[in-house]
Amino acid sequence: MLNLKFVRENPEIVKQNIRNKFQDRKLPLVDEVIELAEQARATQTEADELRANRNKLSKQIGALMAQGKKEEAEEVKAKVNADAERLKELEAKESELNARVKEIMMTIPNIIDPSVPIGKDDSENVEIEKFGEPVVPDYEIPYHTDIMEKFNGIDLEAAGKVAGNGFYYLMGDIARLHSAVISYARDFMIDRGFTYCIPPFMIRSNVVTGVMSFDEMDAMMYKIEGEDLYLIGTSEHSMIGKFIDTITPESELPKTLTSYSPCFRKEKGAHGIEERGVYRIHQFEKQEMIVVCKPEESKMWFDKLWQNTVDLFRSLDIPVRTLECCSGDLADLKVKSIDVEAWSPRQKKYFEVGSCSNLGDAQARRLKIRVQDENKKKYFAHTLNNTVVAPPRMLIAFLENNLQADGSVKIPKVLQPYMGGKTEIR
């Protein structure tokens, strides 16, 4: 969410940013919110004047009564009562105006970083760099579920009966591999100085609207019926929420957390949920990382975060590349985002396995996450998040890139301690 003062003083910058994100339908909202904010301010001024006048008249009533001027006191009382009625009207109007201002401000997108390429959707994202040499072996790479089924490692049919499309049972060495990857990712991030965290898997609505846009909320979140609770779509939501309504001394920043959690997503309107396999599903597990830092450090942390993901995948012998997300592919709260994609030898192309985002002060402003410097001055922090690893999507890349000619799957050295010393799955 932008600062209203910034919108009021820079309407053309805000409008151009909206155009850059190809959200022209939102252009009228800029002038509307400025006008509504002005009305709210004028209403507040009138209400403040009435309150001051009421206090003044109340003192007059006491003085008049003391002087025995009861009739005059009653006239002043009538004026006070009339002002009280008008004050109620003004307070209701001010509340209504402020609610509408907040509603609009929540829909106006954050100002994107100048380095973000302009484009309509993910087809216009820009490749930055490749890490590792993509290999296409001279033997066939089966579909990922076929590989898993060979090892009796997945049961989609039973999951479909129990929960419907978008769910799975993992078993045996495939389930063990899934857990091994999560455990390795956890230790990988702890070794890089992040504090390990297991967060709540449900959050309240004020946290949901603090970390994401209404459109994202509708497309992703499962609501608990009869409760003000939602299942998390990613642990970023509850980890960032940990700092709601806090003021952190500048000396205690940055806050760097890495967390494990199950994730639940409706994937409303998402292509692929009906397809066979585990690429796009309603429930999965993920290791995530977040940073809460000073504004001047967020760009530095952004580069560190996505590099962590690249380094982890390379340690597992999986080639990856990074893509700069274009303006139209950025969610409204994001300033800048980079996708990490893994190589698929079967498809002979890359596919998304993680995303790193800098949200500037958008989440902090919504959730009131503030910092206090040594002079007691308070300001909003910057927040960032990044996927460390998200099985089972990551398992697709792992199985394809480590499948051997005889149909066995090689286990990289770094994972072998988490697999009971196994060097391969057969």
Where are these regions (language model features)?
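TRNA-recognition modules of translation machinery and tRNA-sensing kinases, especially anticodon-binding
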Residues: 27, 130-426
